[in-house]
Amino acid sequence: MEGSVLTLVLLAALVVCGSWGLNEEERLIRHLFEEKAYNKELRPAAHKESVEISLALTLSNLISLKEVEETLTTNVWIEQGWTDSRLQWDAEDFGNISVLRLPADMVWLPEIVLENNNDGSFQISYSCNVLIYPSGSVYWLPPAIFRSSCPISVTYFPFDWQNCSLKFSSLKYTTKEITLSLKQAEEDGRSYPVEWIIIDPEGFTENGEWEIVHRPARVNVDPSVPLDSPNRQDVTFYLIIRRKPLFYVINILVPCVLISFMINLVFYLPADCGEKTSMAISVLLAQSVFLLLISKRLPATSMAIPLIGKFLLFGMVLVTMVVVICVIVLNIHFRTPSTHVLSEPVKKLFLETLPEILHMSRPAEDGPSPGTLIRRSSSLGYISKAEEYFSLKSRSDLMFEKQSERHGLARRLTTARRPPAGSEQAQQELFSELKPAVDGANFIVNHMKDQNNYNEEKDCWNRVARTVDRLCLFVVTPIMVVGTAWIFLQGAYNQPPPQPFPGDPFSYLEKDKRFI
C-alpha cells in the first residue's frame, strides 16, 4: 500500500515539474513576443547600425553536375547566425532556459538567398526551427537542395575540371543594413574564420563522377557598387571539382580510338575484293554516331570544341581522305592499256624506287626455265621430222593410207612422184603448202605476244595500285598515332590549379587556419 502511494506521489511530482517547465517556456515566449511587442518585420538594430550575418556551408552530397543544363545540384546545410537584441532574457528569471526553439517564421530573418540558382527558387524550401540563446544570438541551420548555375568549360572533356560556385546574398537589405561575413570558430581560445566549405566525413556521400579539389569560401565586396545596393556584397562558396574520366575512357574514348585505327586496315584489303570503300565509309558512319552521342552529353556552346570532339573531327577528316584514296587506288587498279598508258617515269617510281623504299616484295623476272628449253628443243625435232615425212608422202596417201589397207589393197611399193628436192618447182610447191601454216603460226604468236604485253601492262597498273596502298598506309598510320597522342596529351596536362585563387598562396583548408 505504501509503495503505491509513493508511486503516485512521484508521478504527481513529475507532472508538476513538467507543467512548471512548460509554463516557464510559455512565459518566456509571451515575454519576448507580447510584452516586448516583438515585430519580425523590423531589423534587430538601430537605424544607422548594421546587423552582422555570419554564414557557413556544410556539404552533405554533391548530387550531380548536368553539363547540358549547366546546373550543379548539391545537398547542403546553410548555417546562419546573427544577434537580435530584442530576443535577450535572463535565464534565471525563466527557469534557467538556455535555448529557445521557435519556428523560423516567428522571428526576423536576413532573407539570404542563392543568387545563381538555376530553378527559379531563390529561398530555402524547408524552414526548420531557429535556436535562440539568452544573449540574443540566433542560430539557424536549414537544409536545402540547391540547383545552382555552373558555367561549363568543355575544352578538355572528358579530362576537364570545373569551377562552380554558390553565391549567397540578401536581395532585401543593403550593405548599410546588414553585413555579411564568414562564420567565426574557436580553437584553443583563438578565433578564426571558416574560409572553406565544411564537409562532415561521416555524413558526406562521395560523387562517382566528380572529385572535389578545392572548396574555398570568400566574402566579396565590390567597391564600385553603391552602398545602398544589395549587389555590393555577397558570400561565395566555391567548388573546384575534377572529373573522374574512367567511365568515359572505357565507354567512349577506347571504342572511338579502336574504330578510328581500323581505317588502316583498308590499305590491307585487296582492290579486287570490292570492300575497300565500304569499310572506310562504315568507319566514317561509326565516328558520326559517336560524335552525335557526345553532342547530346555536352551543352550547345560555340565557345570551345571538346577534346574528344577534336579527335573525332580529326578522325573523320582522315577517314574522308582515305575514302578519296580508295577511289583513286581502285581507279588505278582497274586501268588497262587500252584506256591508259603507263609512262616510264611512273613505272620507275612506283615499280622500282618506292617498292624498294617500302620493302615491298617484287615479282621475279620472267625467264625461260631449263625444262622449257628442253621442251622447246624436243618440239623442234618433232617439227623437222614431220616436215620430212610430209615431203615424202602424197596428199592421197596421207588422207587414205589406212583406208586402203582396210580394203585389202597392197601398200604402195613406190614412193610418190615428186620433183627433185633441189628443183625450183619443188620449193614453190613446198612454200605454197607451208605458207598458210606459217601465217597461222605467226598470227598465233603475235596474238600471244600482244596478249602477254597487255596482261603485263595491266599487272603493272595493279602493282602501282598496291604501291599507292602501301605508301598511304605508311603515311596515314603515323599521322593517326601522332594526332591521337597530341590531342589526348592536352587533356593529361590539364590539371586544376594548386591553389584556389591565382596569386593567393592561401590553401583555404582546415589545416591552414588564419587565426584572428
From Swiss-Prot:
Residues 1-21 form the signal peptide. It is a multi-pass membrane protein. Keywords: Cell membrane, Disulfide bond, Glycoprotein, Ion channel, Ion transport, Ligand-gated ion channel, Membrane, Phosphoprotein, Postsynaptic cell membrane, Receptor, Signal, Synapse, Transmembrane, Transmembrane helix, Transport. SUPFAM superfamilies: Neurotransmitter-gated ion-channel transmembrane pore, Nicotinic receptor ligand binding domain-like. One of its GO terms (molecular function) is acetylcholine receptor activity. Residues 333-470 are cytoplasmic. The keyword NADP does not apply. One of its GO terms (biological process) is skeletal muscle tissue growth. Disulfide bonds join C150-C164. The modification Phosphotyrosine is found at Y389. Belongs to the ligand-gated ion channel (TC 1.A.9) family. Acetylcholine receptor (TC 1.A.9.1) subfamily. Delta/CHRND sub-subfamily. After binding acetylcholine, the AChR responds by an extensive change in conformation that affects all subunits and leads to opening of an ion-conducting channel across the plasma membrane. Pentamer of two alpha chains, and one each of the beta, delta, and gamma (in immature muscle) or epsilon (in mature muscle) chains. The muscle heteropentamer composed of alpha-1, beta-1, delta, epsilon subunits interacts with the alpha-conotoxin ImII. This is Acetylcholine receptor subunit delta. It comes from Bos taurus (Bovine). The lineage of its organism: Eukaryota, Metazoa, Chordata, Craniata, Vertebrata.
